[in-house]
Design a protein with these regions (language model features):
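Beta->alpha loop/short-helix hinge microenvironment recognizer with preference
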Residues: 1-464
Length: 464
């Protein structure tokens, strides 16, 4: 079924193709990239970093190719430039990837049960170890997930053999464009047993979360001690610190009916590292407006162009770097994964409604009930549930900007993509007809270092 439908809206509410070459981010990279690469050539700059920057300069530029959308009713056409599909800092591609991930998890993965966000941050030394030794990320993540499950078992009074369901997002950045690796886990607020019965969680106190934080701290420090990253005395000092730098938060709970809130939460967890709308010029520098004040109380960052490129380069993930992980019943090898996904977005049925969870004033008064969800899962035809969902470009645009891109702005009829143009002569011919630039924006060549200024006279005149 086509995602474009006839709508009764004013003609002004239409999709307008973006113009990346007009943004401050594009212009900065366009003018400074070659000079920056020339200076950084003396360093060990990863190849994938340069590739990411060069791909970004091709993203959204019509001269590199495009798709053609056509309205058969009135003959109106418009062009959609190809994207770079970068995984680094490209705001457009990462925004679409964020929307696709959130839509997929909300519509096709998470059942309609309460969902809680767990956020784990580390002290600077541990962050340094994780950033420079990616092989350590998965073991530390495993410690984190086991601690969450231990909390869910204790609060729900379920068996330790039951399984949780979670998706963890690895965020490598902070709000100030700084390296700050931390975990965001979107966790089903309960446990599943072997047949698919669900045990919801009752009251979760701050004391329980703090005890889980101390357990994570102890096990993570022990892990790095065994791996030789820490000396015994250093590890003991980290365990005795009053302000350890470890932080565990589980205060955000999304109710079962709030699917819009769930999608908003997942978008936050999968958000891009950079927002181009916050970048402005400030004389010979750049001003990046922060989403919230940093530790110094600053609301803006004043950066030189090279400083911006340095920060972006550090935040580009290496190839084949996983951005999110599935755990428990949502893991790829879980025998319950198909059943849980079949229940995505469905209302769970209570076999015995009189045994609903009793929420007490503290964690000791919480009693759990078993909610058989397997009967609901069996009622869903799994053959009709696609194994892989691909959200098209038009659907993502509509979901992000609430604008239907394949609706004709002239007659409000449906438009269709009729061709993908990659041939250079054809590209130039079409762009000429539309009075669009046939050549991509020129990339400034590398500049030499500035001439040094001396205060003393360097003339060849001598006194007799």
């Amino acid at each position: 079924m086509s995602c474009a439908v006839k709508i009764d809206q004013p003609a002004t509410l239409v999709y307008r193709p973006r113009r990346p070459e007009r943004t401050r981010l594009y212009q900065t990279i366009q003018n400074e990239l070659e000079s920056w690469l020339e200076i950084r050539s003396l360093e060990d700059l990863p190849v994938f970093v340069e590739k990411e920057f060069r791909s970004f300069l091709r993203c959204g530029i019509l001269a590199y190719g495009f798709a053609r959308a056509h309205c058969s009713h009135c003959g109106y056409d418009f062009l959609v430039a190809f994207s770079c599909k970068g995984r680094g800092f490209c705001p457009s591609c990462n925004t679409k990837r964020m929307a696709e991930t959130a839509a997929y998890l909300t519509d096709r993965v998470f059942p309609k049960v309460p969902i809680r966000q767990w956020v784990l941050s580390f002290p600077k030394r541990i962050r340094y170890f994780l950033q420079h030794n990616p092989v350590c990320i998965v073991p530390v993540l495993r410690i984190f997930v086991r601690a969450i499950k231990k909390v869910l078992v204790s609060v729900s009074k379920a068996s330790d053999s039951n399984k949780l369901g979670a998706v963890t997002f690895l965020q490598r950045f902070g709000s100030s464009l700084n390296l700050h690796l931390h975990f965001h886990s979107v966790v089903i607020d309960g446990l599943f047993e072997g047949e698919g019965n669900f045990y919801p969680v009752g009251f979760l106190s701050s004391k329980t979360v703090f005890e889980a934080q101390k357990e994570i701290q102890r096990r993570v420090v022990k892990f790095f001690l065994k791996r030789g990253f820490l000396e015994k005395e250093e590890a003991q000092n980290m365990l005795n610190w009053k302000n350890s730098g470890f932080s565990l938060d589980a205060s955000v709970l999304i109710e079962a009916e709030d699917r819009v809130g769930l999608e908003r939460l997942i978008r936050y967890c999968a958000r891009p590292i950079f927002a181009s709308s916050r970048l402005e010029s400030a004389g010979d520098r750049l001003k990046y407006i922060l989403s919230k004040p940093n530790l110094k109380g600053e609301k803006v960052l004043l950066l030189k162009p090279f400083d911006l490129l340095d920060r972006l380069a550090k935040l580009i993930p290496p190839p084949r770097y996983h951005r999110h992980f599935y755990h428990g019943v949502l893991a790829p090898n879980s025998p319950l994964r198909a059943k849980i996904k079949a229940m995505a977005g469905k209302e769970p049925r209570l076999a015995r409604p009189e045994l609903q969870t009793i929420i007490g004033k503290d964690e000791q008064t919480s009693q759990a009930s078993s909610v058989p969800l397997n009967s609901l899962a069996n009622s869903v035809n799994e053959e009709k549930t696609p194994h892989k969902i691909s959200f098209g470009w038009a659907k993502l645009i509509a979901r992000i900007y609430e604008v239907l891109p394949l609706v004709c702005p002239k007659c409000q009829e449906e438009m269709k993509i009729i061709a993908f143009i990659e041939d250079r002569p054809t590209i130039q011919k079409i762009l000429n007809c539309l009075n669009e630039p046939t050549e991509p924006p020129p990339i400034a060549s590398a500049r030499g270092p500035p001439e040094m200024e001396f205060d003393y006279d360097q003339s060849c005149e001598y006194d007799d």
